[in-house]
């Protein structure tokens, strides 16, 4: 009855799995510290440049999430898209995409929104969405799927930003998508 073939669990996308684990730990820390860890490390907001934690927050904000629903929403997309991207571009390049997205979205929030604390991986999600639609990109060709994804996702965020008032940072989604698109274009030869 047994064919002798055994299945094993593989650690197929270490960056994506590590990122996801850090996000889960950040949410747990937030609950254990009653949100103090979010204020210290896992959200970015206008603060003194003399405060060393300000610089950690430019990256740390992507790990913090307001609640379990926020975390699950972001990690679902990251765990669906991330392994494919990590396989195509490699772990180092995917870390670069994540860190670049964190820094750019953190700086945009820091500079332009003095009274807003930003947290969550949605900028990374949008970077992954647009980057994944660029995986078939060849020099001097733009995939139709990229155009459709850009119009649907970025257009939707522009619409939401103009007409819907909520606690979602559509600008972070747009900036994350732009980072993913630009890095996808630059890395098209891989």
Model-derived regions: residue spans:
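A detector for small-residue-rich transmembrane helices and their helix-helix packing motifs
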Residues: 1-190
């Amino acid at each position: 009855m047994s064919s002798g073939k055994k299945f094993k669990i593989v650690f197929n996308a270490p960056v994506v799995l590590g990122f996801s684990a850090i996000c889960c730990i950040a949410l747990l820390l937030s609950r254990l510290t009653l949100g103090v860890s979010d204020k210290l490390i896992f959200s970015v907001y206008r603060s003194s440049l003399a405060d060393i934690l300000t610089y950690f927050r430019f990256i740390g904000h992507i790990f913090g999430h307001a609640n379990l629903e926020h975390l699950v929403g972001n990690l679902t997309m990251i765990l669906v898209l991330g392994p494919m991207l990590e396989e195509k571009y490699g772990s180092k390049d995917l870390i670069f995409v994540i860190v670049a997205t964190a820094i750019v979205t953190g700086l945009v929030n820091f500079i332009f929104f003095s009274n807003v604390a930003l947290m969550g991986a949605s900028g990374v999600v949008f970077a992954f969405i647009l980057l994944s639609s660029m995986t078939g990109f060849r020099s001097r060709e733009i995939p139709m799927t990229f155009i459709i994804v850009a119009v649907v996702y970025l257009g939707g965020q522009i619409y939401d930003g103009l007409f819907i008032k909520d606690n979602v940072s559509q600008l972070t989604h747009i900036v994350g998508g732009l980072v993913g698109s630009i890095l996808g274009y630059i890395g098209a030869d891989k």
